[in-house]
Amino acid sequence: KACRNKRWNVTIFDKDPKALIRTRNFIYPNRYKKWDKKIRLISKDENLFYDLIIIGTPPDSHLNIANTILDKNLCKVLHIEKPLCTPDLKGIGNFLRKVEKSRIKVICGYNHIFTKNTFLAKKLISKNNKIGKILTITAYNREHWGGIFAAHPWLKGPHESYLGHYRKGGGSLCEHSHAINLFVHFSHFLNLGKVKVVNADIQFEKKK
């Protein structure tokens, strides 16, 4: 919708024709009141060159798709939804080497660092000498996946999506990794250096 608001030509590709039908008849009209007839829907990759390609598939498929786009030089800008890949970082080294050699501008969907409140916080920190030395940074991402499943009622729960599987890039850590991104962003902004040690407490609950 954001792309159409800018009056860009938009093509949605999904190898599953049923997903495209669901997008046209249910998802888009429910969110934006009616379907936009100027949006193209395709189920076969046409290998055309685009100004912008957005990868919005499950995280465990991101790098494979992105590598193909980089190899074929299919766009000017490649936007990959977060998280960039799965927690095991499998294939990330090869991907980053391709990015360095490519003319394609590659970005990831951590957009919270560009919000008005983030800019305001940085402005206040820069101008207010009363804050003093920064001792700790705490980042919260108070979000619940209930909204996601409300928008995808054909899913019976997390188990039917990557969201319920952390190895596939789901789970609370990956799905809500905006908080990690904000933490690192402010750490760099305050010249506090890179993360050296990571410690986490996780409680797993198995439900029958």
Model-inferred region functions:
Residues N9-T11, I107, T138:
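A structural signal for isolated positions on well-ordered beta-strands in alpha/beta enzyme cores
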Residues L52, L63-I113, N129:
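Beta-strand-loop-alpha-helix segment that lines the small-molecule cofactor/substrate pocket
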Residues K1-K33:
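N-terminal Rossmann-like dinucleotide-binding module
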Residues W35-Y50:
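Short acidic low-complexity segments
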Residues I55-D60:
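N-terminal glycine-rich "phosphate-gripper" loop used for MgATP/nucleotide binding
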Residues R22, L52, N64, T68, ...:
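Alpha-helical elements of Rossmann-like donor-binding domains used by nucleotide-donor carbohydrate transfer enzymes
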Residues T115-K207:
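Predominantly a Rossmann-like dinucleotide-binding segment in NAD(P)-dependent oxidoreductases
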